[in-house]
Curated annotation (Swiss-Prot):
Lineage summary: Bacteria, Pseudomonadati, Pseudomonadota, Alphaproteobacteria, Rickettsiales
Function, in words: Phosphorylation of dTMP to form dTDP in both de novo and salvage pathways of dTTP synthesis.
Name of the featured protein: Thymidylate kinase
Keyword flag ATP-binding: yes
Species the sequence originates in: Rickettsia canadensis (strain McKiel)
Positions bound to ATP: G14, G15, E16, G17, S18, G19, K20, S21
Keyword Transferase: yes
UniProt GO cellular component terms: cytosol
PROSITE patterns: THYMIDYLATE_KINASE (PS01331)
Pfam families: Thymidylate_kin
């Protein structure tokens, strides 16, 4: 699906408290140190318009379909305005969350929602999928303890262990469904640097 770009598209996925944002940043800093053309972005967000949509999505309680469509609209703006242009210039794009997060966070709230998310992406979005996705696999019990230490939170952070388990199981399911693309990094008992080194081995 990536025949319209020259660069490489890397995404990081995982539940709240998994450390995926930290690993996204660490990989970005590493590639920059190697003089590799690279940008770091995130979803929901990444552009002025999408960041405004993010504020609604992560703080307001929306109807499930409204939340899904909000996420998809933000992604379209992000892809067209930012991701695809820099990929065409040969950059590596690192994105903290992408389509798989939408499947798990929004898709699970709808009947046949996971398949719906991927079908909507295929139908509505430009023909682009990640070249590689890193699923940072951290057990929910560990993840929720990390989140409880944060000073800031959104509506997803403060949901209980049942929600964390559901999201975790969803990412595990997706890693089994798309094994060629999604690389699972078992990170519960590893340091940040150890996780980073494992990620580098897949590049």
């Amino acid at each position: 699906m990536n025949n319209l770009t020259q660069g490489k598209f890397i995404t990081f996925e995982g539940g709240e408290g998994s450390g995926k944002s930290t690993q996204s940043q660490m990989l970005y800093e590493y590639l920059k140190s190697q003089n590799t053309p690279v940008i770091l972005t995130r979803e929901v967000g990444g552009t002025i318009v999408s960041e405004k949509m993010r504020e609604i999505l992560v703080h307001e309680e929306l109807l499930p379909m409204s939340e899904l469509l909000q996420a998809m609209a933000a992604r379209y703006d992000h892809m067209v305005r930012k991701i695809i242009p820099v990929l065409k210039e040969g950059y590596i794009v690192i994105c903290d969350r992408f389509l798989d997060s939408t499947a798990c966070y929004q898709g699970l709230e709808l009947e046949n929602g996971i398949d719906l998310v991927y079908n909507l992406h295929k139908t509505l979005m430009p023909p682009l999928m990640p070249d590689i996705t890193f699923f940072i696999d951290v057990e929910p019990d560990t993840a929720i303890k990390r989140v409880n230490l944060r000073n800031m939170s959104n509506k997803f952070d403060i949901r209980g262990i049942d929600f964390y388990n559901k999201i975790y199981d969803c990412f595990k399911e997706l890693s089994n469904r798309f094994p060629a693309r999604i690389k699972t990094i078992k990170a519960s008992d590893l340091s940040m640097l150890e996780v980073h080194e494992l990620i580098k081995k897949h590049l």
